[in-house]
């Protein structure tokens, strides 16, 4: 399950243009997944979207992308069923459900589960996690414990 989760004010979610650029210039997965650039909302669109929300949930799981996206989708649905009809989730990293993405929403095998990655939309995961009180740092060794973050805009 979830290692830790926190409710935060949506103003604590940091969106910056450079984040999306790190996807474009430096990520070998760029353009290969529907939940990554160039198929995802721009930082400007994300900033506009965040103005429509006041509360969000940020959570982390130990390094398991499938678990992250499964929890993300389950929580988003649960918030929706509880009356939070604007609930909208963001994952971390590319979609884990297919070995290779078709990169076509009409042909997607998991269209109900695809959610944009925070990074692809310009969300600075490091600063947002720090704002929520999570300890987060750059990992310098592959043996260090990895946490993946998910975010749900609630209302």
Where are each of the predicted segments found?
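Catalytic cores of enzyme domains
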Residues: 3-33, 37-155
């Amino acid at each position: 399950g979830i290692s830790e989760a926190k409710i935060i004010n949506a103003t604590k979610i940091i969106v910056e243009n450079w984040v999306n650029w790190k996807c474009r210039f430096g990520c070998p997965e760029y353009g290969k997944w529907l939940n990554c650039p160039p198929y995802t909302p721009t930082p400007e669109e994300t900033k506009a979207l965040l103005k429509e929300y006041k509360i969000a949930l940020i959570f982390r799981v130990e390094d398991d992308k499938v678990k992250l996206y499964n929890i993300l989708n389950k929580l988003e649905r649960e918030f929706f069923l509880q009356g939070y009809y604007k609930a909208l989730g963001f994952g971390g990293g590319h979609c884990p459900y297919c070995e290779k993405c078709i990169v076509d929403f009409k042909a997607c095998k998991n269209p109900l589960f695809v959610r944009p990655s925070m990074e692809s939309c310009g969300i600075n995961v490091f600063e947002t996690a720090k704002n929520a009180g999570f300890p987060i740092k750059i990992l310098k060794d592959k043996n260090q414990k990895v946490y993946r973050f998910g975010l749900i805009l609630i209302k």
